[in-house]
Structures are given as C-alpha cells and as structure tokens.
Amino acid sequence: MVDWNAKYGAVDTMLYGEKPSDIIKKAKSEYADRLGHVLCLGDGEGRQSRALVRSGFSVTAIDISAVATNRALKRDKEDELVIKRLIYDVSKPPPLQTEIGSCFICYLHFSVTERQSCFRWVKNTLPTGGLLFIEGFGPEQPTFNAKYNSGGPGKIELLYDPKILQNELPDFTVHHSLCIEAMLGDGPGHQGLANITQMVLEKK
C-alpha cells in the first residue's frame, strides 16, 4: 500500500502539477449544464478541483493524504478559491452534506476491493442522471512506463480497463469510453507517453 503522506512529502512542489486532466476539459465543454455541485475523489493537491472552481463550479474534494490536502488548502488560499476539502479514505467516504450532481475520479488507482467499495458509494450518492467522470492509467500502462517512465502502478488489477469498469458499474450508462496513447506533463509524478483510459457515465 502506498504511503501517500510520505510520497507527497518527498517533494517540495506539486507532485502532479497544476494542469487539470483532460477529462476536466471534456466535462466543462460538453456537460457544463449538468455538473451541479461537483465531488472530486482522490483530489490530491487539488489540480482538478481548482480548475473546476475557476470555471464557476462549486466543489467538494476528498483525499486520504493530509500532506496533499494541506498543500491544496494553501494553494486555494493563495488563489483566493473556496473549496471544501475533507481528509478521508476515498474507498469509503463520509456522508455528504451537499447533494452532488457529478463525481470525478482521476488517477485514483487502488485495489479492486477498494475500487468497488468506492463505486458502490458513488452509486448511492449520485442522483439518477448524475454523471461520473473517470480518467486514469489504462491496462497497457506497465509497458508504456517501462519504455517512457510515465508513472502509474505496475499491478494490472489497479489499472483502468474500460470493460472491467463497465462491468463494475452496471447501474450506469456509458456515454464515452476510450483507451488511448497520450503525452502527460503533470509535474514530476506523471511525465511522458502513457496509456490512458477515459469514461463518462450516467447513473440510471
């Protein structure tokens, strides 16, 4: 199991940079009127949530790492942004006080048991018609990482295979699903050519 406090604490800069993931751009351009209050799970140092708030959305962000969350709060304050941040295990988040319209899970790679627990919670938390946005390393990433040192977990079960995720999310309709090669430039943590999965799903 990764010690995320140690991993974030080992660098004195944003581990994954400040640029949001491509799925954020897709959501803002194609689904803006349906996002509602946004939940970002595994938000780390806050690059996804800050991009959404800068575009006018209200956001709650949850991450397991106190180091990353405190760094995110510091950047929020510097940028004069208001984001509700919670420190929790994202495989079993707490009840939310605000109804959400959408949820983002970006580069959140954990065990099958934890992932399925998280998905059950998301299903129970999103309203009918709520949107789930997923982006992360695809099943071929170990090969890409060996060649390009672009990051990501080495265990296949931690990666995002669209077919497996679709089977784990039977209560959702898939609107967008792809697995592509993409060049990452996300801080020192993710650099180089990578195999990336993207999905957009709607709760039935």
Describe each model-derived feature in a short phrase.
Residues 110-122:
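A short, conserved alpha-helix within the catalytic core of class I
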Residues 79-90:
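Conserved SAM-binding strand-loop segment of SAM-dependent methyltransferases
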Residues 156-177:
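Short alpha-helix
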Residues 1-33, 140:
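Conserved class I S-adenosyl-L-methionine
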Residues 65-67:
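Conserved SAM/SAH-binding beta-strand->alpha-helix loop
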Residues 129-137:
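Conserved beta-strand signature within the Rossmann-like core of class I S-adenosyl-L-methionine
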Residues 95-102:
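A short acidic, Gly/Pro-enriched loop at the edge of an enzyme's catalytic core
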Residues 72-73:
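Conserved SAM-binding loop
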